[in-house]
Swiss-Prot record:
Keyword presence, Nuclease: no
Protein name, per record: Protein translocase subunit SecA
Source organism of the structure: Helicobacter pylori (strain P12)
GO molecular function: ATP binding; metal ion binding; protein-exporting ATPase activity
One GO CC term, this protein: cytosol
Function: Part of the Sec protein translocase complex. Interacts with the SecYEG preprotein conducting channel. Has a central role in coupling the hydrolysis of ATP to the transfer of proteins into and across the cell membrane, serving as an ATP-driven molecular motor driving the stepwise translocation of polypeptide chains across the membrane.
Length: 865
C-alpha cells in the first residue's frame, strides 16, 4: 500500500527508467534530418566509421564506447530500415532497443514490433566484431526473422546466418557461426555448445564467444524451458522386461488402498498394503533391499506413468512412440524424453516399443548456458509476473515499454460454472453468437484432450472451425495468421502459434476485433496473459474472457473451496454462473501459489546444477587447453607420473628400500610391469637408493626412449589427443556417478540431513576422485603406448585422425535428451582394457572397480590384503 502511494508521487522504478530513455530518444531524433540527407553510400560509410571507432577501443572499454555511439548507431539503423525495409522505428521501439542494449528484458505487447526492435541492439553490439546471437523458440521464427531483417543487416555491412535443426553439415554450421549475426533456437545454441566441448580440434568448435544474446519470447525459454536440461546421452544396459513387469504391478494397485496421490506436488506415496502387494507380485521379500533398488524405482515410475501422466494432455502416441506435449505451448516436443525411466514407463503403459534408458555424456541447463553470456537481454509480451525470478536467477531486470497506441482490448471478468459440461455449453453458445455475427474468435484450451472435446461439440453444432494443437503443429503459422478472418473460429492449445501476428481488416475492427475465449485458467498467469495478448495489437479493438468450472484442474486442486462456498450460498441453478472481481482475484491467488511452486522447483534444479556447472566449467576449460597446440602436455604427463608414483609409495611401509620386505619389493616389481609396462629386475630394486628416484627415472627414460621416433609436433598431438580421450571417458563416468548420486540424494532428508548440502559435499569428493583417476589412468595409458618405428607413429597419427573424426561425427541429434547409437567408449588399439569405474572389479572381490583395484592396485604382492 505504502509502496503504491510512493509510486504515485515519485513514479515507479519503471517510470524513472522510461524517463531516462526518453531523453536519449530526443538525441536520436535530432540526428534524423542529418542522416536523411545522406546517400546510401554516405550512410554506410558513417556506420563503418562507428565500427572502426568501437573496434579500435580496448576490449574492456568497448561497452562504454557503445553507449557513446548509441545515438548515431540507432539513428543510422532507423534510417537504413526506412530505406530497405520501408519501416521506421517508433520512439517506443527506440526505447526497447536501449533496454536490450542495457542487458534487460523489454516487455512489449503483441504487435509492437519486437523483431524490428532487436535490430537496434543487434546492429549496435555487432560493432564490437563478435557474433551476436538472436535466440527464438522455434525454427520457423528463426528463419522468418533472419530472412526479414537480413537486407537491413547487409546494408549495414553485416553478414547473417541461421542455425536450424535442418543444418546437419558441420562445415556449414561452422560457416554460419562465423557470421556477424546468428539467428537460431535455444536448443540449437545449447546443443552446439555441448557438442563443441566434445570436439577434438579448436578449429572445429563453432561457438567462438558468448558476447551478447537477445532471447525472443524470453519467458518461454528462460522460465518455461528451465526445468528441462539439455542432455546428450548414450545407452545404458537395463533389462527391458522390468518396465513391463512394473507396469503390470502398477495397474493392479488401487488408489487410496495401495497408494495415495499428491496432485499438488505430482507425487505418489505407496502405503504399507501397497508395498506388501508389490513384494508379492515381484516375488521378493523386501522391495527396499539394495538389490531390489531397480525394481522399486521402476515401480515408482510406473505408478507416476499410470496415475499422474495422461494421454492427449501430457503426451500423445504417434508412430509407435510416446511423444511429449509441452505443457506451456501445447506443441509436440519431438525427440525429447522424460528422464529417470519415466519415459520407458509410459512406453510400457501404452504398449509401444520400449527404448533404452540412457547415460548422460554431456548436459547443461538453459539457466547456466545463457548465464555464460557477457551480456544477455530478452523480449516478450509477458514478463512482469516473473520479474522476481528473472532478477534472482539471471540478474535481468524487466522494463515495461509503453505501447505505441493505447490498448483498446476489453478484458472481461471470469465466468465460473459449477461443472465442465455447463462451461462448455456456455462456450459453444458464445462462439455461435460471435460466428453468426462474423466476428473472429480464438479459443484457448489447456490440453489436446480439451481441444478435441471442443472440436466435437462445434462439429455437432455444425460451426466451421480450425483446430491448432500439437497434432497440427506443422500448419501452426498458417492457421494463426487466418485466425483474424471474418467468421473464423480457431481452437488453439495454450499458446501454440506464438510469435505470429494476427492482422485484422477494417471490417473486422468494426465488428469488435478478435474475441478471445479462454476455456480454462493455466497454472501461470503469464500464459493466460499471452492468450489475451493475441487480441488488441497496435491499438486494435478486441475482447477477452475466461470461462471456468469448479472441475478445472487449477480450481479443483488449489482454489475451489472458497469459490464453491460462494456458489452454494448463491444457490445457482444448472447453467448459471458467477462473475465478480472477488472470484477473479481468488483464481489469480491460486495461480500465484502454483507459480511459486514452479519457481521453487526451477530454483532447486539450478542449485543442484550450479554444483555440476562449476565442475563442467573446470573440465571444459582444461579441454580447451589440451586442444591448444601450445599447451605443455609434457609437463602435465610428468606431473601425473610424479602423482602416480607418490600414490604407490605412500602405501609402502617406508621410503627406504632397506625397510621393504622381499614380498613388497616383488609386489612393486609386478605393479610397475602390469600398470606401467616397466620391466625392472628385483635385484635392481633391492640395490636402488632412494627407491623412489630410481623408479621415477626408470619410467621417465622408458617413456622418452619410445617417443624418440616422433618429432615434437607429432608427439604433442598424440599426447594431447590421448589425454583428451582419457578425460572424456572419465568425465562421462563421472556424470553417470553424479546422476546416481542425485537420484537418491533426497532420501538423506529422512536422516535429518539437508540433501543439497550432502550433494555438494559428496559431489566435491567425487570430483576430487575424478581428477585423481585421470592422473593415474593417464600415466598408465602413456606407459603402455608402443612405437617401435616410424611406421608405428604414422599408423598412430592416422588412427587418431580417424578416432577424432568418429568422435565428432557420432550419431548426435539436437534434442532435449539425446541418444547416441553407438558405444562411445572408443579405446586406442594399443591400450590394455581397463574396467569402467562402476563395473564389477575383475579381481572378483564383489566390489565396484573404483572402490577396489582402481584405488589399491591388483590384489598381489605389494598391495595384498
Amino acid at each position: 500500500m505504502i509502496k503504491a502511494i510512493i509510486g504515485k508521487i515519485i513514479g515507479t522504478r519503471n517510470d524513472r527508467w522510461i524517463k531516462q530513455y526518453k531523453k536519449q530518444v530526443l538525441t536520436i531524433n535530432a540526428l534524423e534530418p542529418t542522416y536523411e540527407k545522406m546517400s546510401d553510400v554516405e550512410l554506410q560509410n558513417a556506420f563503418e566509421e562507428l565500427k572502426k571507432r568501437v573496434r579500435s577501443t580496448e576490449k574492456d572499454l568497448q561497452e562504454k564506447t557503445l553507449l557513446e555511439v548509441l545515438p548515431e548507431s540507432f539513428a543510422i539503423t532507423r534510417e537504413a530500415s526506412k530505406r530497405i525495409l520501408k519501416m521506421r522505428h517508433f520512439d517506443v521501439q527506440l526505447i526497447g532497443g536501449m533496454v536490450l542494449n542495457d542487458g534487460k528484458i523489454a516487455e512489449m505487447k503483441t504487435g509492437e514490433g519486437k523483431t524490428l526492435v532487436a535490430t537496434l541492439a543487434v546492429a549496435l553490439n555487432a560493432l564490437k566484431g563478435e557474433s551476436v546471437y538472436v535466440v527464438t523458440v522455434n525454427d520457423y521464427l528463426a528463419h522468418r526473422d533472419s530472412k526479414e531483417m537480413e537486407p537491413l543487416y547487409h546494408f549495414l555491412g553485416y553478414s547473417v546466418g541461421t542455425i536450424t535443426a535442418s543444418v546437419r553439415d558441420d562445415d556449414e554450421r561452422l560457416e554460419i557461426y562465423s557470421k556477424d549475426i546468428v539467428y537460431g533456437t535455444n536448443n540449437e545454441f545449447g546443443f552446439d555448445y555441448l557438442r563443441d566441448n566434445m570436439k577434438y580440434s579448436l578449429e572445429h568448435k563453432v561457438q567462438k564467444s558468448h558476447a551478447f544474446a537477445i532471447v525472443d519470447e524470453v519467458d518461454s525459454i528462460l522460465i518455461d524451458e528451465a526445468r528441462t536440461p539439455l542432455i546428450i546421452s548414450g545407452p545404458v544396459d537395463r533389462r527391458m522386461e522390468n518396465y513391463n513387469k512394473a507396469d503390470e504391478v502398477a495397474k493392479s494397485m488401487q488408489v487410496e488402498i495401495d497408494f495415495t496421490i499428491d496432485e499438488k506436488n505430482r507425487a505418489i506415496l505407496i502405503t504399507e498394503e501397497g508395498i506388501k502387494k508389490a513384494e508379492n507380485l515381484f516375488g521378493v521379500d523386501n522391495l527396499y533391499k539394495i538389490e531390489n533398488a531397480a525394481l522399486s524405482h521402476h515401480l515408482d515410475q510406473a505408478l507416476k506413468a499410470n496415475y499422474l501422466f495422461f494421454i492427449d494432455k501430457d503426451y500423445i502416441v504417434a508412430n509407435n512412440e510416446v511423444v511429449i506435449v509441452d505443457e506451456f505451448t501445447g506443441r509436440l516436443s519431438e525427440g525429447r524424453r522424460f528422464s529417470e525411466g519415466l519415459h520407458q514407463a509410459l512406453e510400457a503403459k501404452e504398449g509401444v516399443s520400449i527404448k533404452e534408458e540412457s547415460q548422460t555424456l554431456a548436459d547443461i541447463t538453459f539457466q547456466n548456458y545463457f548465464r555464460m553470456f557477457s551480456k544477455l537481454a530478452g523480449m516478450t509480451g509477458t514478463a512482469q509476473t516473473e520479474a522476481t525470478e528473472f532478477l534472482e536467477i539471471y540478474n535481468l531486470e524487466v522494463v515495461s515499454i509503453p505501447t505505441n497506441l493505447a490498448i483498446k482490448r476489453k478484458d472481461l471478468n471470469d465466468l465460473i460454472y459449477k461443472s465442465e459440461k455447463e462451461k462448455f455449453d456456455a462456450v459453444i453458445l458464445k462462439i455461435k453468437e460471435l460466428h453468426d455475427k462474423g466476428q473472429p474468435v480464438l479459443v484457448g484450451t489447456a490440453s489436446i484432450e480439451k481441444s478435441e472435446t471442443l472440436h466435437a461439440l462445434l462439429k455437432k453444432e455444425r460451426i466451421p472451425h480450425t483446430v491448432l494443437n500439437a497434432k497440427q503443429h506443422t500448419k501452426e503459422a498458417e492457421i494463426i495468421k487466418d485466425a483474424g478472418l471474418k467468421g473464423a473460429v480457431t481452437i488453439a492449445t495454450n499458446m501454440a502459434g506464438r510469435g505470429v501476428d494476427i492482422k485484422l481488416t477494417d471490417e473486422i475492427k468494426e465488428l469488435g476485433g478478435l474475441y478471445i475465449i479462454g476455456t480454462e485458467r493455466h497454472e501461470s498467469r503469464r500464459i493466460d496473459n499471452q492468450l489475451r495478448g493475441r487480441s488488441g495489437r497496435q491499438g486494435d479493438p478486441g475482447t477477452s474472457q475466461f470461462y471456468l468450472s469448479l472441475e478445472d484442474n487449477l480450481l479443483r486442486i488449489f482454489g475451489s473451496d472458497r469459490i464453491k462456498g460462494v456458489m452454494e450460498k448463491l444457490g445457482l441453478k444448472d447453467g448459471e454462473h458467477i462473475e465478480s472481481k472477488l472470484v477473479t482475484r481468488a483464481v489469480e491467488n491460486a495461480q500465484k501459489k502454483v507459480e511459486n511452486l514452479h519457481f521453487e522447483s526451477r530454483k532447486h534444479l539450478l542449485e543442484y546444477d550450479d554444483v555440476a556447472n562449476e565442475q563442467r566449467k573446470s573440465v571444459y576449460k582444461f579441454r580447451d587447453e589440451l586442444l591448444d597446440a601450445s599447451y605443455d602436455i609434457g609437463a602435465k604427463i610428468a606431473e601425473n607420473r610424479e602423482y602416480a608414483l607418490n600414490q604407490i609409495f605412500s602405501k609402502l611401509k617406508a621410503f627406504d628400500h632397506q625397510n621393504l620386505s622381499e614380498e613388497e619389493l616383488l609386489g612393486l616389481k609386478n605393479v610397475l610391469k602390469e600398470d606401467f609396462n616397466a620391466h625392472v629386475a628385483l635385484e635392481d630394486l633391492e640395490k636402488a637408493s632412494p627407491i623412489e628416484k630410481f623408479v621415477a627415472e626408470k619410467l621417465k627414460s622408458d617413456y622418452e626412449n619410445k617417443m624418440k621416433v616422433l618429432d615434437s609436433e607429432q608427439r604433442s598431438r598424440i599426447e594431447r589427443i590421448v589425454y583428451l580421450q582419457i578425460l572424456d571417458n572419465a568425465w562421462r563416468e563421472h556424470l553417470y556417478t553424479m546422476d546416481n548420486l542425485k537420484t537418491g540424494i533426497n532420501l538423506r532428508g529422512y536422516n535429518q540431513k539437508d540433501p543439497l548440502v550432502e550433494y555438494k559435499k559428496e559431489s566435491y569428493n567425487l570430483f576430487l576422485e575424478f581428477i585423481e583417476d585421470i592422473k593415474i589412468e593417464a600415466i598408465k595409458t602413456f606407459s603402455k603406448i608402443q612405437f617401435e618405428n616410424e611406421q608405428d607413429s604414422s599408423d598412430a597419427e592416422r588412427y587418431l585422425d580417424n578416432f577424432s573424426e568418429e568422435r565428432e561425427h557420432e550419431s548426435v541429434t539436437y534434442r532435449h535428451e539425446e541418444t547416441l547409437d553407438e558405444d562411445l567408449n572408443v579405446a586406442m588399439k594399443a591400450f590394455a582394457k581397463t574396467p569402467k569405474r562402476n563395473e564389477p572389479c575383475p579381481c572378483q572381490s564383489g566390489k565396484k572397480y573404483k572402490d577396489c583395484c582402481a584405488k589399491s592396485g591388483p590384489k598381489k604382492g605389494l598391495f595384498a590384503k
